[in-house]
A protein has these predicted regions:
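Conserved phosphate-binding elements of NTP-dependent enzyme cores
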Residues: 1-945
């Protein structure tokens, strides 16, 4: 391959036919930054991930033993003739976010591991009882201290053997009696060890063994030394000195110790600062930082209801059952009944209903025909906790789980670590405090640390700090200055988690690796895009090949090489329409090239809607980093919430507004972030969240089933004369139910053939030929087409086929209008891209009848979308707003922002420096706000009108 006039090695893909790829050949240069672009569904991911990465992964797994391959499961060979020049491949995608609650930004980047090492080697311990520095002495130092303090005095030397624990300790006393020890000190009182001696087993006891009683003299130092060493052996490196005259106690230890209280710590090791280790984790929350507690508000969400009307959610409405008879008895005890609204019940009655009572209740019920049936009541809380028990089934646990709320651990305050770990400090900060800092703040703190450390300790810390600073710099380079090390990995967006993995890879300093990234610019404000591009170039310059699936204009123009897949999507895509440098591409006339060169652009609306005069007003929002903000959302408009990454957009919309509305409209149990008050919810009757998650959890889900049109199609086939003659019901035409489906493949259309030590092979079902249905079902036809033929049609074909059946046509036509005419009606959702899934969901909403009072929430809807796809998306959103609905989207894409009616811009920065409303109003108004970073970029965009 010739690149910039020089011959270079490349990854050569020959005859790729994965998904919709049309037997394409393409060369991708080594040691360059290559962008693969094209419409959503054109075949970009099919080439990058399902062909190049899949083959690289398969080759890697083939180096394993046959046994290991069988255990791991082997990737199927992609449908490609040949791939040459393939170096080891690492994929950094969006869908691999770690959902483990123990995974944090710090653990996944290994920065926290280095911090643990730093604290194990260079921290200072402080007593969590007295707050004084812990000390550590050698045996020689302890001897000199004893001689200095007790010269000429009579003392007992004691070895601690039991510390504040329950038990009778009969065997322990007998063991020491046989060894020749005569006395012990039990709970501060000296006692002789007698035969059969034991303590109250149900009380906590502290026991010290009397090792020796002597008068301290420097002339008899050998006896003192022997006694001290013996006491250390018996007391596990700890001893006490009891002054015979004053009864004063002094503590000594070879480990870290508080001389005032006797508290001792083990010598710090890295695992002592790990919340994933028993030695470091908080005993209350087991290192999670939170505990799940039963929430009374979730059990009784609507206090205006009575118990009989379903006010107690776990019970539902009144049934003639024992639990209601028991609660009726409690109500009678407090002078009320089951029809009394919960808000009017005495607090004592509510307490007994929730927590139970030991008092025997007089059960009165006509069904029992008795008034003399007495029972105690354990309470709803205990019942729910029993359902949550590990021995309960998953269904019961899921049911019980809805009544729990996650609360910050009361013992560690969310730090995840035990008391000891939290009382080791470096320059006044413990490891949990450092982990809670923003990356930028932590970097500054560490960079200044050498000014605050003793030279001896800095010599130990220097290399560790350098390693941490290097990794933090990589995170700053990819725009993650606002996250903290203790941020849970599960809470990261796809783009954030991908950039964290990118920073980790840069830090690993691998060479000769092929990296494949899926839209790393997701969730990144335009201000930070150049930092990301510089990071990718740094990865390239270290001697790696970087392939990026991307639509970002800046990324494309800064690439070394561009591969444009198209010309359209689905069946009309899958071709390489251009491959070359950005400069060469600007001279072309592909769809992508036209948008890059400015020949095509998304138009700016002529007018901005002012809305219907109603507002949703949120007051006092202060969750996460929101700074007690007040915000108004004008209804009947297209609103865009903007701001740099980490400024609080998702906290405001997804974690505050959406749960508030869902609670009000649907009695949802999801807890919103803290806020003051909300007004205007009476002006909406429905909230719809449209994201890019898959349509369903299995490949059986498809556009026809999701939009509901498949039900209409099945009903059409059921009402055909042939079906009526045969007595077929709608279930006959479902591939999910027995009867009409092919039972050989269970309606899948294919069979998985196990090859033992080779990859499993998916082959079309020999019984149905991949059609999913049995022969009898396929004999029923409409206009010459069976149900399987209909599912195999593209949306465009189906629109023509069902042109005379409005019930079906209207739903399918909406799919066509949102730009999905190329996908099949029965296409498995697992093969749809994120952008395609989102548009299927939007189409399903457009097809529904609405009252014009629906609120649509979209989180970064442009993810995975080409310029042309964004144009189609905006036209769909326009239709929703024209019907009187409200659309709120959070996005960084300037094409979306410039088309909004109203903008709410958060900032000014991310993390702790964000969370304020810096600008609001029309795009033109925000563009003129000098303190708005978004406004600066918007001004440039609007000037190109």
């Amino acid at each position: 391959m010739i690149f910039n006039g020089k011959e270079t090695e490349c990854v050569s893909v020959l005859g790729a036919r994965v998904h919709n790829l049309k037997n394409i050949d393409v060369d991708i240069p080594h040691y360059k930054l290559t962008v693969i672009t094209g419409l959503s569904g054109s075949g970009k991911s099919s080439l990058a991930f399902d062909t190049i990465f899949a083959e690289g992964q398969r080759r890697y797994l083939e180096t394993f033993s046959a046994y290991a391959r069988n255990m791991l499961g082997v990737l199927e060979r992609p449908d490609v003739d040949k791939i040459t020049g393939l170096s080891p491949v690492i994929s950094i995608g969006q869908k691999t976010t770690n959902k483990n609650p123990r995974s944090t930004v710090g653990t996944s980047t290994e920065v926290y591991d280095y911090l643990r090492l730093l604290f194990a080697r260079a921290s200072d311990a402080v007593s969590h009882i007295s707050g004084k520095p812990m000390v550590k002495y050698s045996v020689e130092k302890i001897l000199s201290l004893i001689l200095e303090k007790y010269e000429g005095k009579k003392i007992y030397i004691l070895a601690p053997i039991v510390k504040n624990r329950k038990g009778h300790y009969k065997d322990l006393f007998e063991q020491y009696r046989k060894k020749g020890y005569l006395h012990v000190r039990v709970d501060g009182e000296l006692k002789e060890i007698t035969f059969g001696m034991k303590l109250d087993r149900y009380k906590n006891h502290t026991v010290e063994l009397v090792v020796d009683r002597l008068k301290v003299s420097s002339k008899d130092e050998k006896r003192l030394k022997d006694t001290v060493e013996l006491a250390f052996r018996q007391g596990k490196d700890q001893l006490l000195i009891l002054d015979v005259d004053t009864n004063a106690i002094s503590y000594y230890s070879k480990a870290l110790m508080d001389p005032d209280t006797g508290l001792s710590y083990l010598d710090p090791a890295p695992h002592n600062f790990s919340f994933n280790s028993p030695q470091g984790a908080c005993p209350k929350c087991k290192g999670l930082g939170y505990v799940n507690l039963i929430d009374r508000e979730k059990i009784m969400p609507d206090m205006s209801l009575s118990i009989k009307d379903g006010g107690v959610l776990p019970l539902g409405k009144y049934k003639n059952s024992l639990v209601f008879w028991q609660i009726a008895a409690i109500c009678e005890k407090y002078g009320c009944d089951l029809t009394t609204p919960l808000a009017e019940l005495p607090e004592e009655a509510l307490y007994d209903i929730l927590n139970g009572t030991d008092e025997k209740l007089n059960i009165k019920n006509e069904t029992l025909s008795t008034n003399n049936y007495f029972l105690t009541f354990d309470g709803l809380v205990k019942y729910i906790e029993l359902q949550q028990d590990e021995e309960s089934g998953s269904k019961a646990q899921k049911w019980a789980g809805q009544f729990f709320s996650r609360c910050v651990c009361p013992e560690c305050g969310g730090a995840r670590l035990n008391k000891e770990a939290r009382h080791f400090f470096i320059n006044g900060k413990n490891i949990a405090q450092l982990a809670s800092m923003d990356i930028s703040e932590l970097r500054d703190w560490l960079a200044d640390l050498h000014h605050h450390m003793e030279p001896k300790k800095w010599k130990i810390a220097d290399e560790i700090v350098k390693e941490i600073l290097g990794r933090l710099d990589f995170m700053l380079d990819v725009g993650l200055d606002y996250v903290s090390l203790n941020r849970a990995s599960a809470s990261l967006s796809g783009g954030e988690s991908q950039r964290i993995r990118l920073a980790t890879q840069i830090g690993s300093q691998l060479v000769n690796v092929l990296y494949i990234l899926d839209e790393p610019s997701i969730g990144l404000h335009q201000r930070d895009s150049h930092r990301l591009i510089d990071s990718l170039k740094k990865l390239r310059d270290e001697g790696n090949t970087v392939i990026v699936v991307e639509h970002d204009k800046d990324m494309m123009l800064n690439a070394d090489y561009i591969v444009d897949i198209g010309p359209k999507a689905g069946r009309r895509g899958g071709y390489v329409v251009f491959a070359g440098t950005p400069h060469q591409m600007l001279a072309q006339h592909t769809l992508t090239a036209d948008y890059l060169s400015g020949v095509k652009r998304i138009p700016i609306p002529e007018h901005r809607r002012e809305g219907n005069g109603h507002f949703i007003r949120l007051r006092g929002c202060k969750g996460h980093n929101l700074k007690n903000v007040d915000v108004d959302f004008p209804l009947g408009t297209f609103i865009c919430v903007t701001g740099v990454s980490g400024s609080g957009k998702s906290s405001l919309v997804n974690a505050t507004l959406q749960p508030i509305i869902s609670r009000r409209l649907y009695r949802s149990l999801t807890e919103p972030l803290p806020y003051g008050e909300v007004e205007g919810l009476e002006h909406i009757d429905k909230v719809v969240t449209v994201d890019q998650s898959p349509l369903g959890r299995t490949p059986r889900s498809n556009p026809a089933t999701y939009t509901g049109v498949f039900t209409d199609i099945r009903n059409l086939f059921v009402n055909l004369p042939e079906s009526k003659i045969r007595g077929y019901k709608p279930g006959r035409f479902s591939f999910n139910a027995k009867g009409g489906r092919c039972e050989v493949c269970s309606g899948n259309g294919y069979k998985s053939v196990e090859m033992n030590f080779l990859p499993d092979v998916l082959v079309p079902c020999e019984a149905c030929g991949g059609k999913r249905y049995n022969r009898e079902t396929l004999e029923v036809k409409f206009k010459g087409k069976s149900i399987a033929d209909v599912l195999d049609m593209t949306i465009n074909q189906a629109v023509e086929f069902f042109d005379a059946i409005p019930a079906i046509l209207n739903k399918i036509k909406v799919l066509q209008e949102v730009g999905l005419g190329y996908i099949k009606l029965g296409q498995p959702s697992s093969t749809l891209s994120g952008g395609e899934c989102q548009r299927v969901k939007l189409a399903a909403e457009l097809a529904k009848r609405d009252t014009g009072k629906t609120l649509y929430l979209l989180d970064e809807p442009t993810t995975g979308l080409h310029f042309e796809d964004i144009k189609i998306l905006l036209s769909v959103l326009e239709k929703l707003v024209q019907k009187g609905n409200t659309v709120i989207t959070t996005d960084h894409n300037m094409d979306v922002i410039k088309c909004a009616d109203y903008i709410i811009d958060l900032g000014p920065e991310g993390g702790r420096n964000g969370g304020n409303i810096v600008a609001f109003g029309t795009p033109e108004q925000v563009a003129n706000q000098k303190n708005s970073i978004t406004g600066r970029f918007l001004k440039k965009e609007l000037s190109e009108k």
